[in-house]
Design a protein with these regions (language model features):
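Conserved glycine-rich Rossmann-like NAD(P)H-binding loop of the short-chain dehydrogenase/reductase
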Residues: 1-7
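A hydrophobic C-terminal alpha-helical subdomain
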Residues: 219-301
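Residue-level signal for the nucleotide or nucleotide-sugar donor/cofactor binding architecture
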Residues: 35, 70, 159-165, 194, ...
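Short, amphipathic alpha-helical "lid/cap" segments that border enzyme active or binding sites
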Residues: 79, 164-172, 276-284
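NAD(P)H-binding glycine-rich loop region in Rossmannoid oxidoreductase-like domains
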Residues: 10-13, 18-84, 97-99
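Oxidoreductase cofactor-interface core, primarily capturing Rossmann-like NAD(P)-dependent enzymes
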Residues: 6, 16, 85, 99-211, ...
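Short beta-strand segments at enzyme active-site cores
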Residues: 88-94
């Protein structure tokens, strides 16, 4: 198994090659730039033959320029290199939110999904729900006695959060499970779907505190988007910030569950589950200091 990684990987480029090697023990590590077709071919594939390609590549912020460069074009380069290397099957980590593609990064992901499906190679397109790290930004503030922030009532959305380990196992199983070949696969973690308010209630219970919530109106995000969108016509940097605000609004108002088009609603029962670890387990580890949470761009609050 060969892993193609950046020379400085991790959040903020904190991981040197030796750090990456320890995290990926047992794999052959190759360093390069996944957005550069020549680097991918010469430093990644190196003219060798491979059976499969597994890609977890994604833009960090979802801003339009990054999204089209990474979620789409870098994958197009990888697909071309994979074909040259004799790859027969591609496992792609996508995202469940592409069901309703209102944002640039969702459109970029969908564009590559279509390219992969039309490529003639075997594929497994995995669309996970929310990640634990994306839902863990308020642990420290609640430990400090502050209220848990929710948009609206805290019941506008729901999801089936999935752990990194459970998702990783699911991705790996796509290589040799024929039932997952040539399919688009939505997947969530174990248990019932939970709302942001329920997430807060779990956290308060773990910390032995009475639940306290502060409601943030969705209209506040609308106002921010309007101001930044208008200013962004003059200042490009503000246009990028407007897109980030749109991303925040999307996650504040859209559930990470399978969309039932016929019923025009999200449906937890249609959202498959895998794994054993729950968000409550993760919160317990964070609350007791048994785990840390490097969210980086995976945060709203």
């Amino acid at each position: 198994m060969v892993c193609f990684v950046r020379p400085r990987a991790g959040v903020g480029g904190a991981l040197a090659p030796d750090d990456s090697a320890r995290l990926l023990a047992g794999a052959t590590l190759r360093l390069g730039d996944a957005t550069d077709a020549a680097s991918l071919a010469n430093e990644g594939f190196r003219g060798e033959r491979f059976d499969a390609l597994v890609s977890c590549l994604a833009s960090r912020t979802g801003a339009p320029v990054d999204a089209w460069a990474i979620d789409h074009q870098a994958h197009v380069h990888a697909l071309a290199a994979a074909r040259q290397a004799g790859v027969g099957h591609v496992v792609l980590l996508s995202a469940l939110c592409v069901q309703k593609p209102l944002l640039a990064f969702q459109q970029a992901k969908l564009a590559f999904e279509r390219a992969l499906i039309e490529s003639g190679l075997g594929y497994s397109i995995v669309r996970p729900t929310a990640f634990f790290r994306s839902l863990s930004g308020q642990v420290d503030r609640v430990k400090r006695g502050k209220p848990f922030l929710v948009f609206g009532s805290g019941t506008l959305t729901a999801c089936k959060p999935i752990s990194d380990a459970d998702l990783g196992a699911y991705l790996a199983s796509c290589l040799d499970d024929p039932s997952r070949h040539n399919r688009v696969l939505p997947i969530g973690g174990p248990g019932d779907a939970i709302t942001p308010r329920q997430q807060g209630e779990h956290l308060f219970a773990l910390l032995g505190q009475a639940p306290r919530f502060k409601q943030v109106p969705v209209a506040l995000l609308d106002a921010i988007i309007a101001v930044l969108g208008t200013a962004g016509r003059v200042v490009p940097a503000l246009a990028a910030k407007a897109e980030l605000a749109r991303i925040g609004r999307y996650y504040a108002t859209e559930s990470m569950l399978v969309w039932d088009a016929a019923a025009s609603r999200y449906d937890a029962d249609l959202t498959p589950s895998t794994g054993r670890r729950t968000l409550a387990d993760h919160y317990a580890d964070l609350a007791q200091g048994r785990a840390t949470n490097e969210r980086a761009e995976h945060a709203v609050f």
